[in-house]
Amino acid sequence: MSLPFLASFKKTVAKLDTVGVGIQKTESWLSTGNYALNRALSGDFMRGIPVGKVTLFAGPSGSGKSFIAGNLCLEAQREGFHVLYLDSEHAIDVDYLGKIGVNVNDDALTYISVTTIEDVNSVLSEFFSNYTKTYGKDNTTAPKTLIVLDSLAMLSSATEMENYAKDGIIKSDQGILAKRRKAMLRLAVGQLGRLPIGMVLTDHVYPQDIMMGDGSWAITNSTKFSSSIIGIITKLKLKEEAEVIGVKMKFETYKSRFAKLGTKVTLEVPYNKGMSSFSGLVELLEEMGVIAKGTQIGEKLLWVTEVNGEIIKFKEKDLDKATAEKILKHPLCAPMMARNSVPEVSIEEIDAVTDQDEVPQLDTEALIKKSRKVKLTTE
């Protein structure tokens, strides 16, 4: 039943600075630049992090959180976003950002060094205030922005800094820190919902007491409740013979309103060129039952699948965008993609696959027979 005063009521409350009227759907996404990571975050190979919400990458020191943040800056700039980078670690690697293609000029990336939670509050308040004065709320034509805060764990409080200046001793009150961090995140979440702005946080995680718990990583409650998506990253060294040439990381979906929890992907991020779009994709597609191991040619393994009647055969090192996007039209991939991007697959086919308890296994033997007369798709 409609109430007669609703029209004027909505018009009045819409004028309030901190109020929004109407349900906001997540319609804008920013790709991470990596298909497997996209899928783990959003349940969709083509989408990555949601605009208008908070995404958290958490992990132990040196796990690669800042590398992921750097790649997101690159993808954001490719999509026309401005990047606001808040750095509490004071360790941003401009050379690395330049190597992977991030534009660090002021017109493309605004870099601000912060020390305390109060610093972040002031910066965000000023930015949101100026943004809404210039473009208003719910403005679909306003320029998009990505805010990166790297990292939450290194932020102190103004009280800590005052005590240090007075006594030369760092006195940390975790209770005060937690409350102020929570207030800062409330401010961000409240503003982001009506603006074309995405926010990425990095944070440390801490091992729980193995004697009292399961030995898994612990995430602070303030970030757990304010983030729409949380991924936990752990690190391996990426080596070429004995030389360490980058970061090899394991990513696991800890929280997501859009994807299956517990999804795991392994990603490689070389120092000299950043993350490949295809890193982790072959392993994920094999796990899903989308592709199968075909024949061996020398030391190289061929992978095969069949999509819409077409046999697709490729070597992992030769996988390219055109081949990957053909494979991602496979019905088993369709539930994880925007349906309007895969018109060849009917809704009935998607539902039939989604409703199955187990992923159907590929008939590898039949596929190999069919593929013998087919040239490599990537040739």
Predicted regions span which residues?
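C-terminal regions of RecA-like/P-loop NTPase motor modules
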Residues: 1-20, 30, 238-379
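Catalytic P-loop NTPase motifs of RecA-like helicase/translocase cores
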Residues: 92, 155-156, 208-209
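Phosphate-binding/switch loop-helix module in NTP-utilizing enzymes
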Residues: 115-194
